[in-house]
Design a protein with these regions (language model features):
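Membrane-interface alpha helices of multi-pass inner-membrane proteins
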Residues: 181-183, 194-211, 222, 315-320
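Membrane-interface transmembrane helices that cradle and orient dolichyl/undecaprenyl
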Residues: 172-195, 300-302
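Membrane-interfacial loop-to-transmembrane alpha-helix junctions, especially the N-terminal start
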Residues: 1, 120-123, 192-195, 199, ...
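Signature aromatic-anchored transmembrane alpha helix within multi-pass, membrane-resident enzymes
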Residues: 238-249, 345-383
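Active-site lumenal/periplasmic loops and adjacent helix-entry segments of GT-C-fold
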Residues: 11-178, 211-215, 386-392
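Hydrophobic/aromatic-rich transmembrane helices and adjacent perimembrane loops
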Residues: 215-217, 325-353
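Membrane-helix boundary/interfacial segments in multi-pass membrane proteins
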Residues: 17, 23-37, 154-168, 254-287, ...
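Transmembrane catalytic cores of multi-pass membrane glycosyltransferases
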Residues: 37, 202, 206-303, 323-325, ...
Length: 393
């Protein structure tokens, strides 16, 4: 798949540039997206390689505190590195490549499952991977006015471009999330023992990697399953929702207990994860072209995308709940929005004349990709200058 090769190249290009062109004496370390987080993952890998258990401590705090179950992927990588006598960073780099590949494959399967046609699926894939919002024109407008304006937060909940540069647990979580949605949110989902076991494995993996958004997705599965059951479209989704909830609880409950009842971990990671969602009107800046197309295409969405719409609505509600990590609750919603937008774009283009349809597609591509291209250039430039760009710091 050409897109898979392109994403692999983009993900590795900053590392290649830093290896050949960074300032003399500097070495590449960590990730180029949310670079401040990598020290915690490195510490978890080191602790995993030095101990038999899976609990970790916060090595960056002198305060006395208990151990916690955190960052299991990186603890596991550290253990494998110790057993194989290879550097943990090498395994982490290989995990990055694998995670990005799995994410792109899962995204394509997701787009094919819910898009109205193969051409709409291709549009959805490109919008999900490279589509941004109106950040660039908004920034230009603010410069003209001479005042600071909101120009987007570029978090991976609202822009999947960052998943091509993020630490491996995030694209892995996105891959398992999209695969779970693909298997469970469509009508007529089969409820075979093997299928339910796969569902349980996917939701357990997602809960271990990125637990914040799991309740919204499982809740969407439950609501959609009830509708499908009551309208005679099978019980597969409802059974999958029950299994998913049971599989998620053993992971989610200890996580909630640790960060709600333990004073140290609660204070440490509440302060670190202050992640407010954009105000509703600011979503136009973050996902403008896709949001406008999706609103246009809601009435054109077929019955097969009903589950997708319910998940989007629940994610939209969840991301404004009064919790510190608001926008984490909408993880996975951007690809869903891209599919609805792509369906609308293809449907509208089909009823326009050839020239108008081409102009519409070109306009959407320019509007959606302009900000992503600018940030991508910034990422690559920072690899040469050894200076992380604040937009993705």
């Amino acid at each position: 798949m050409p897109v898979l090769a392109l994403t692999f190249l983009l993900g590795e290009l900053p590392l290649l540039l830093s290896a050949c062109c960074a300032p003399q004496g500097a070495t590449g370390l960590g990730t180029v997206w949310f670079v401040n987080d990598f020290a915690q993952y490195e510490a978890a890998m080191r602790q995993g390689s030095e101990q038999q258990g899976w609990l970790v401590r916060d090595v960056f705090s002198p305060e006395p505190h208990g151990l916690a179950f955190m960052f299991p992927l990186y603890v596991g990588l550290g253990k494998v590195a110790a057993l194989a006598h290879v550097p943990a960073e090498l395994l982490e780099r290989l995990a990055e490549v694998l995670a990005r590949g799995l994410f792109v494959v899962a995204l394509w399967r997701f787009c094919r499952a819910f898009a109205s046609s193969r051409s709409a699926a291709r549009v959805a894939l490109l919008l999900a991977l490279f589509g941004g919002g109106f950040e660039l024109p908004t920034a230009a407008f603010g410069a003209v006015l001479g005042r600071a304006v909101y120009v987007g937060n570029w978090s991976y909940e609202l822009n999947s471009l960052g998943l091509l540069f993020a630490a491996p647990h995030v694209p892995l979580a996105a891959a398992s999330t999209l695969e779970l949605a693909t298997r469970s949110l469509r009508p007529g989902a089969a409820a075979t023992p093997r299928g339910l076991m796969v569902t349980a494995g996917l939701v357990a993996a997602t809960s271990l990697l990125h637990p914040f958004h799991v309740p919204a997705l499982v809740g969407a599965m439950g609501l959609v399953g009830l509708v499908y059951w009551r309208t005679g479209r099978g019980t597969g989704t409802l059974l999958a929702a029950v299994v998913a909830g049971l599989a998620a609880l053993p992971v989610l409950l200890p996580t909630v207990a640790t960060f709600s009842l333990d004073a140290f971990w609660g204070a440490t990671y509440t302060a670190q994860n202050l992640l407010p969602s954009p105000l509703p009107h600011e979503l136009l800046v973050d996902v403008g072209p896709m949001l406008l197309l999706a609103l246009l295409g809601l009435r054109r969405t077929g019955a097969g995308a009903f589950g997708l719409i319910i998940w989007l609505l629940l994610a939209l509600i969840a991301m404004y709940l009064p919790v510190p990590y608001q926008r984490r609750l909408a993880f996975g919603a951007q690809p869903a929005l891209a599919v609805v937008a792509a369906n609308a774009l293809v449907a509208v283009a089909a009823v326009l004349g050839r020239r108008r349809a081409a102009a519409l597609r070109l306009g959407v591509a320019a509007a959606a990709a302009s900000s992503s291209l600018l940030v991508l250039v910034g990422v690559l430039a920072s690899s040469v200058r050894n200076a992380p760009v604040p937009v993705y710091r």
